[in-house]
């Protein structure tokens, strides 16, 4: 099975940017193939990676629930739609979970979807999951446990408290089968002693700091994929230094 890395944190803290840079890091270090999974209902990992997204697994789930399986058995229909949702690229592929569930029971669709995702993930060396702050969607992606959890936070107390909750939730759900690290993002200057002390008090193992960089926002506003930032960009360099320390070479 693939080595599963989940990236989580509340919105607006650089979570998806970090996930995109992680995919790029794995590809550049020949740790391929990689399956990137956008498990955030507000799907935009594709934009960070510079890919067009035409369909999501949420669409397939809705179609199956409404009986729109085109005369196929449900398992064959889900398998077909999963393959249609897969966006292929050099060294990695992307798939998005898409819209959240509507009203009614989705148990059958979710069960088939998880089985199909497990089969798909078996073809990859690494699985990178861009997750929402809540870890509920991880069970839709794989029945395997998470090998590495990276929790992203900005340097605010509120965001770090959310990061602490993510770590506790992962432990309570018993989905974590490896270490959990905190990555502080969008930090101006050096991380203050008070910030480092707060992380320690919350039981968060700090892996490193990614600086705040104006060129990141300018790059994004220009419509350029953040994952294609120049190699000498401070954000890229800081992220890669962290990945060098925490990502095992499977």
Predicted regions and their residues:
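Walker A/P-loop phosphate-binding motif and the immediately C-terminal alpha-helix
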Residues: 3-41
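Short, hinge-like loop/turn segments at secondary-structure boundaries
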Residues: 51-55, 169-170, 197-201, 225-227
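N-terminal phosphate/diphosphate-binding loop that engages ATP/GTP or pyrophosphate donors
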Residues: 27-90
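C-terminal boundary of histidine-terminating zinc-finger modules
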Residues: 222-233
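Conserved beta-strand scaffold positions in the cores of enzyme catalytic domains, especially
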Residues: 4, 36, 92-94, 206-209
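Cytosolic-facing regulatory segments adjacent to core modules
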Residues: 78-84, 88-89, 93-129
């Amino acid at each position: 099975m693939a080595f599963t890395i989940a990236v989580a944190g509340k919105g607006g803290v650089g979570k998806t940017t970090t996930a995109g840079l992680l995919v790029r890091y794995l590809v550049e270090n020949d740790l391929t193939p990689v399956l990137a999974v956008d498990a955030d209902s507000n799907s935009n990992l594709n934009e960070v990676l510079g890919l067009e997204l035409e369909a999501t697994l949420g669409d397939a789930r809705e179609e199956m629930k409404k009986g729109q399986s085109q005369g196929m058995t449900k398992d064959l229909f889900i398998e077909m739609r999963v393959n249609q949702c897969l966006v292929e690229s050099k060294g990695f592929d992307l798939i998005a979970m898409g819209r959240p569930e509507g009203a009614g029971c989705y148990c059958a669709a979710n069960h088939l979807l998880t089985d199909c995702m497990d089969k798909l993930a078996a073809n990859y060396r690494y699985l990178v999951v861009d997750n929402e702050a809540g870890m509920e969607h991880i069970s839709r992606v794989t029945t395997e446990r998470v090998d590495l959890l990276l929790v992203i936070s900005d340097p605010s107390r509120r965001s770090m408290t959310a990061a602490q909750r993510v770590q506790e939730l992962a432990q309570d759900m018993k989905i974590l089968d490896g270490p959990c690290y905190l990555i502080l993002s969008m930090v101006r200057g050096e991380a203050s002693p008070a910030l480092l002390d707060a992380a320690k008090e919350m039981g968060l193992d700090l892996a490193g700091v990614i600086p705040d960089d104006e060129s990141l926002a300018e790059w994004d506003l220009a419509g350029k994929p953040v994952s294609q930032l120049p190699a000498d960009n401070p954000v890229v360099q800081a992220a890669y230094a962290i990945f060098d320390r925490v990502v095992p070479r499977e």
